[in-house]
Amino acid sequence: HTIFQRVYVDGVGEGHLSGIRIPESNWPIMDLSSNAIICNGGVNPYHEPVSLAIIQVPAGSTITAEWHPTIDDVNTTESIRPDHKGPVIAYLAKVPDALQTDVAGLSWFKFYEDGLSDDGTWATDRLIANAGKVNFTIPSCIQPGAYLLRHEIIAVHKAETYPGAQFYLRTLLTIFVFEVETAATPQMECAQLNITGPGSVVPSPTATFPGAYGSTDPGITVDIERLINYTVPGMPAEG
């Protein structure tokens, strides 16, 4: 159970809930075919008022995303339960308007992923050790303009069958985990960015949500108690 609720740009905080489309509930998304897998919302209605802030981000800068169980800004050291193991992922999609509400059909490219390390620790373990914060670098070469940042945690501790993986995601402008868990559960939100800089690259490959993940993907349906290697879902990350 966790929610992406604060962004820092090169160490400078943008304010609590600012620039992020935050759901009221930290319940995860379970259905890979649902449009809620894009930026949350829908089954998890957004916290009102939805932020109209657009976060100014120079290309090449370091983004820090901060996750906590509730949006009341009280549990600032807790992030996600230690038994919720899984990868942490970040995507960007170029958009005409960072405040647009229609997110269907966008072309997303993955620029960050962290999964299972050789020492047996997960991205979520590192998130917990860093008090709910994860850092990633915005590619320095990409075209300037309006973007949505899709930030996601996929809990795969009970993902032996589908639906089981728990998807926690947010778009910059989380989801609660059901206690009877039998599949991967993603949590995601989307943040609203304006990226500046002289870049001209249109990254590829891209993917659309729903569709980027399949129920039989090895990173979605997986028994982590019998793992040798773990494949992070989706396309390779392009920095």
From Swiss-Prot:
Chief localisation class: secreted
Binding site for O2: H157, Q166
EC identifiers of the protein: 1.14.99.56
Subcellular location: Secreted
Domain of life: Eukaryota
Cofactor detail note: Binds 1 copper ion per subunit.
Any one of the GO BP annotations: cellulose catabolic process
Keywords (A to Z) from UniProt: Carbohydrate metabolism, Cellulose degradation, Copper, Disulfide bond, Glycoprotein, Metal-binding, Monooxygenase, Oxidoreductase, Polysaccharide degradation, Secreted
Glycosylation (residues): N75, N135, N194, N229
Enzyme class, broadest EC rank: oxidoreductase
GO molecular function: metal ion binding; monooxygenase activity
Biotechnology: Lignocellulose is the most abundant polymeric composite on Earth and is a recalcitrant but promising renewable substrate for industrial biotechnology applications. Together with cellobiose dehydrogenases (CDHs) an enzymatic system capable of oxidative cellulose cleavage is formed, which increases the efficiency of cellulases and put LPMOs at focus of biofuel research.
Residues where Cu(2+) binds: H1, H84, Y168
Disulfide bonds: C39-C190
Cofactor: Cu(2+)
Protein name, UniProt field: AA9 family lytic polysaccharide monooxygenase C
Protein's organism: Gloeophyllum trabeum
